[in-house]
Amino acid sequence: MKTFKYRLRPSKNQRTQLIHTLEVCRWVYNKTLATRKIAWEQEGKPLSLYDTNKLLTVWKRNHPELKGTHSQVLQNVQERVDLAFRAFFRRLQAGEKPGYPRFRGYGRYDSFTFKQSGFELGDNGLRLSKIGTVKILLHRPVAGRIKTLTIQRDVIGNWYACFVCEVEPEPLLVNDLAVGVDMGIESYATLSTGEKVPNPRFFRSNEKDLAKAQRKLSKARQGTLERMLRRRVVQHIHQRIANRRKDFAHQLSREWVDSFGKIVFEKLAEKNMLRNHYLAKSISDAAWNQLIAYTTYKAENAGRVVVTVDPRNTSRQCSCCGTMVEKSLSVRVHTCPICGLSMDRDQNAAINILGLGLQSLGIAHEAPASRHGE
C-alpha cells in the first residue's frame, strides 16, 4: 500500500460543507462512543461494530442531517471507534495503562474517509459525494488501485486528499551493501561507514519564533478575533516544523533505501527516553521513529531489508574485540585498552548495531581491524 497526498482548493461553500461533514462525523463518533461506554459500564461487555452499524440506521431516521453525509463515511467513523476500543481492551488485557477512548470536542475531528465509492478523480477535480467537485493540485499522478480516500484538515485549516493505493512493488537492483545506524542528538545519525548526518534541529531553529507567537497568544483575550489570529500563527509555526521534519525524513530514508540492501536501526523507546528532562526537547525534535517508519515502508516496496535490534551495550562494546569499555557521554572517541581500536564512539556503536542485525539474519559480520600500536 502507498499513500498519495494532494492539496485541495475548496471554494468557500465547499469549505463550509467539508467542515459540516467533519462535525457530523464528530457527532457520530461521540454518539457511538457514548453508546459503547454505557454498554460496557452497565453490562460489562463491548458492543460489536455490527451492533453499532445497525444503530446508525436508527440514528439516521431520528437525525435527518446524517443523510447528507455518505454512508461509507459514517461507517468508517464507527470503525475508528471500534479500533479505539480494541486498542483499549488489548492494553487492559496486557496489564498496561488502558487509556479509555475519548470524546471529541468541537473542532477536534479532522478527517473523514471514503472506502472505494463516493468519490471520483477526474480531469476537472475530485468529485466528492454530497459535496461536489473540488479543485485538487495533482503534482504527481495517482498510481495503482485506489482503496480508500481520506479528506484531511490540518491545524491551520488547509485541506488535503490522501489516496491509499494498492501498488505493485518496484524492487531495486540487488544490493548486498549493509549499514548500521546509530541515532543521536549531536549528530542526527552516524552510519557504520563513518558517515554522519547533521542534526537539522527543526524545532530548535524555530523555537524563538514560536515562543514569541505563544507570548502574544497568551496576552490576547479569550473569544476575540485577535486570539483566533494569534492561535493560527502558533499553529502555522508548528505545521511548518512538522512539514520540514517530514520532508527531511522522506529524503534521508529514500537515500538510504537507494544505497543499501540491508539497513539496521537500534530499537528506540522514545517514550522512556523523553523522561530525561534535559534531553526531552531534543529527542522529541529528532523524531527518530518517524525516520525508521519511513525507511521501513520504502524498503518493503523496494525489496530491501530493515532490521531493528536491541541497542543495549552497543556504545560500550568494542566493535573489534567485544571488550566492554566504560565511558561517559562526554567521551566522544572509543578507545579499546585491549585491542587498541580507536574510532568515533557513535561509529563504533553503529558497527555493533550492524553486527547484531546481520546476526539476526544469519549473516556473518566482519569486525573492523585492530589499530593496536598505532
Regions found by a protein language model. Name each.
Residues 50-154, 285:
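Acidic carboxylate diad motif detector
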Residues 1-74:
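Gly/serine-rich nucleotide phosphate-binding loop at the start of the catalytic core
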Residues 3-5, 16, 130, 140-145, ...:
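Positively charged, helix-rich recognition surfaces that bind polyanionic ligands
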Residues 33, 37-40, 85-96, 167:
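Long, hydrophobic, amphipathic alpha-helical segments used as structural scaffolds
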